[in-house]
Amino acid sequence: MSSNSDNTECFGGVNYAEGMRKRKRNPVRNSTFQEYLDARNARYPRSGSTSDSDEDYTTRSKYESDVSEFKKMMDLETLPPPKAEPQAQKAEPDAAKEEPVSTTSYILNEWVAPMIGHFLAMCMYELLFK
């Protein structure tokens, strides 16, 4: 394999840089991202375009219509404001509201008591069935 001055030749005598320069479609060039987007949008028009040459793109698919209907349903700005509950039909009176629970009682009720119950159940199982 001969060495090339710009060091672009690879195994098998394939010059990858030259192949990239000779590409007909999508030539490699230095461009900005906005130029790339403009070129891409020119090749693949969006569904909102009005030209007659892109009929395939203007028809909305079933998926797109379903998505737009879902967005309409989920749009919180168009929903009516929630109705206020009448004061006479409250779910619970003011006296029945829960008071804040201390951390100690929460730990005892939610963690320690079930563990003790599980331990006692295991002891009873050992006594009865073994």
UniProtKB/Swiss-Prot annotation:
Domain of life of the source: Viruses
Biased segments, Basic and acidic residues type: 57-75, 91-100
Region (Disordered): 1-100
Protein name: Uncharacterized gene 75 protein
Species of provenance: Equine herpesvirus 1 (strain Ab4p) (EHV-1)
Lineage: Viruses, Duplodnaviria, Heunggongvirae, Peploviricota, Herviviricetes
